[in-house]
Amino acid sequence: METIDIAAVKPPISLKEFQRIDIRVGTIEGYEDIKGANRLIKLQVNLGDHQRNILAGIKTERADPRDIIGRQALFVINLEPRTMMGEVSEGMLFDIGYADGITPVLAVPEKPVPNGTRAG
């Protein structure tokens, strides 16, 4: 297991602020390379009642990004769309470890749940 220097706890936020974040389970159904991007890939995510394209900087974190196809993960789905490398991201993949400089892993439910299930 990798080791880290534990980061300081961020300033408190209210429960009301936290409840504004819409975190849902989705299944990664595919991915595309983004031309000219070293780390960024475009994920096609099934969120139950709709699909989203979500950009994630995970290309270099795995020997083969296709390893995550078919996996469920957590996504923030109420972020404003953001354009990167000419592509629009409609959310954010939750991962664990990137902010601490270790090899990131997906934040996943412990067993399969319906796509679109809310976290929190």
What are these regions (language model features)?
Residues 1-120:
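Phosphate-backbone binding interfaces of nucleic-acid-interacting proteins
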